């Protein structure tokens, strides 16, 4: 929001003459200015995300979305559900996260013999979710790393919905267990 506020302020100032009176811009010029400022907002945001280093909360998501920020912002479909956000960030019903915040004794997995219950294990490996995953793989392909998933869900709306469906089904079952 801070980047948008700064660019809106810059656009306002550019639309005034030296005495503060409004400059009459054509609709085409105004639209070009908005696009230019929007591009600067996204570029500034991307730079800040990528420069934030390894101390950034959500580093996994920043690494996956950062290079595709334009496409992420411009996608014409899909909002993030609570459960999609959990899978993307790893913050949610995962032993690794719950152990780290003191909600569970350790990070073990409750649905298979894996030693560490992470979002990536749930998304790409756990045999407990093989049926749910197969529908996802048919649309997105075998690479279910977060960067590959983000790329796929930004390419097609049906891929977005498949990922959303996987997250809803699997996380709701994990919550019920």
Predicted features by range, described:
Residues 1-88:
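Acidic catalytic cores of enzymes that act on phosphate-bearing nucleotides/polynucleotides
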Residues 68, 72-177:
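Family-specific functional microsites
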């Amino acid at each position: 929001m801070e980047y948008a506020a700064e660019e809106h302020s810059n656009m306002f100032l550019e639309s005034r003459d030296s005495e503060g009176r409004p400059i009459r811009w054509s609709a085409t010029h105004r639209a070009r200015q908005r696009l230019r400022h929007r591009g600067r907002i996204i570029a500034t945001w991307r730079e800040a995300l990528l420069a934030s280093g390894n101390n950034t909360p959500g580093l996994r998501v920043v690494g996956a979305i950062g290079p595709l920020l334009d496409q992420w912002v411009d996608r014409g479909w899909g909002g993030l559900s609570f459960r999609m956000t959990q899978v993307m960030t790893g913050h949610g019903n995962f032993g690794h996260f719950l152990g780290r915040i003191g909600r569970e004794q350790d990070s073990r997995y409750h649905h298979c013999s894996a030693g560490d219950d992470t979002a990536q294990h749930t998304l790409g490996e756990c045999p407990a979710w093989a049926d749910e995953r197969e529908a996802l793989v048919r649309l997105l392909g075998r690479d279910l790393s977060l960067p590959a998933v983000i790329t796929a869900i930004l390419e097609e709306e049906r891929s977005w919905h498949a990922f959303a469906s996987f997250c809803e089904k699997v996380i709701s079952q994990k919550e019920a267990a």
